[in-house]
Amino acid sequence: MFVVAAQSAFAQSTIFNIPSGDTVDKGKGYFEFDFLPQAPGPDAGSRIYLYNPRLVVGGPHDTEFGVNIPAFHQGGGNAACNLSSTCGYIEPNFKWKFYKNDDEGLSFVTGVLLHTPLNGKTTVAGVSQNETWGLFYGNFTKKIKTGDYGPRISAGPYVVADSNLTDFTSVGAHRGGVILGYEQPLSKKVSFVADWYSGKNYYGYFTPGISITLPGNGLFNAGYSIGNDSWANSNATKNRYVFLYYGVTF
């Protein structure tokens, strides 16, 4: 789920959604808060709001350990989490940068994330909902060193280990695919950034936006997440969100 011009000062774990080629420095921490309102909202019922605080701590040998606590709020309740208005999850995660070449602008990372519901599991029409799954990924990044504002590109595979097909892939049948990212500095403090998970599933979004470096080791990102199934069934899903977040390294 970052500005290339600030990589010497920051080492964020994601661009918007996909893992970046960075890891937080050993002994440092990174906190982020994401806010995503569904836009446009559904024709009937309440729109969804996503709140996601994230904490990452840098470990030895270019590793990092983190935890996300995303919560999806929808007035009127959600059958997938026992009709609660808020579906909460916890996502411990780990990332390792196993290769880097600063002179060539190259890095390779791999990682894993465990997605587990906090509201407990339930069954709807005999089908288990709100299951636990694991995300595994790899990512290659290349910084193109042309002038002061060369871009950085990211690409790699991902796969999800999930025992229940109907849960993770509720809008499709894709349990893996590719991740792509692009970070283009526009000035010393502003960059255009975009990332994409392929597939019609929980992660399947394209998100372009702007990243702004702030004083005090802070960062603000604003973008728009477009679900890969967004216009399916005559636009019935409206699977699109404004994506806002603030992050700070400490």
Where are the regions that the model predicts?
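Short loop-to-alpha-helix "cap/lid" segments that border enzyme active sites
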Residues: 173-183
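Transmembrane beta-barrel domains of Gram-negative outer membranes and organellar outer membranes
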Residues: 10-164, 168, 183-191, 195-197, ...
